[in-house]
Amino acid sequence: SSELKVAIKKIIKSSPLLEKHFKVMRSEIRCLMCDTEYTPLAYSKDKLDGKLAHLFLADEVGAMDGYPVEAMRSSQITLKSKLGILISTQYPNDDNGLKDEIDIAKKQLDGVYSSGKKYFALLYEPDIELVPDWKTNDSVLYQSNPVAVDNADLFSELKDNRQLAVLYENKRENFLCKHCNIQYKGVGSEGYVDLISVQNCSEDVPDEFWRGKIV
């Protein structure tokens, strides 16, 4: 949230026409025209329910669970014109707030779901049939990074990173998630299976299987 504040501050400072309408303070950015404030909020699991947001901007949603976004949406329930902006690359963890947002956008695009609300999404990810060929197919890079179509330097850098990701497993997760928007769990990702799931399948596994296991 503080990084977003810095970015907004730079935009305001770059334009004399904008600057006179805003007051940039240490803890917030205030719009003098309509007396509203932009306040950076730190991630929390249970302390966002009391906030009232006319508009919210969430960056790196994939790094969070769904609670912060849902808390902000709940705070807007009485507003006629609701607005929330979500920005993120892909992340390897399964419990992230980005997955549902992508699914909702695709379901609305396919006509499977319609909430009656305006929902605008820019999804930069490769076609699913191209994903298995990420090591060699340049279309994966172009679809995930459309700015690279007209930027030869960026495309060359992406190809170099792809080559390293092919050669080194420990570089693969970052490349696929951050530069291709493909969810991938590489080496070093922490795996977790809850106890209830283990208990449900324990009867189907011989007792010898569990002996000597490091947990």
PLM feature spans:
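Inter-Walker segment of RecA-like/P-loop motor cores
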Residues: E3-H54
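Non-catalytic, compositionally simple segments
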Residues: Y67, R73-V215
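Structural motif
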Residues: L55-L57, I85
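Glycine-rich nucleotide phosphate-binding loop and flanking beta-alpha elements
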Residues: D46, M64, N93
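Residue-level detector of functional hotspots within protein domains
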Residues: S15, V24, L41-A42, E70, ...
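Walker B catalytic acidic pair
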Residues: D59-A63
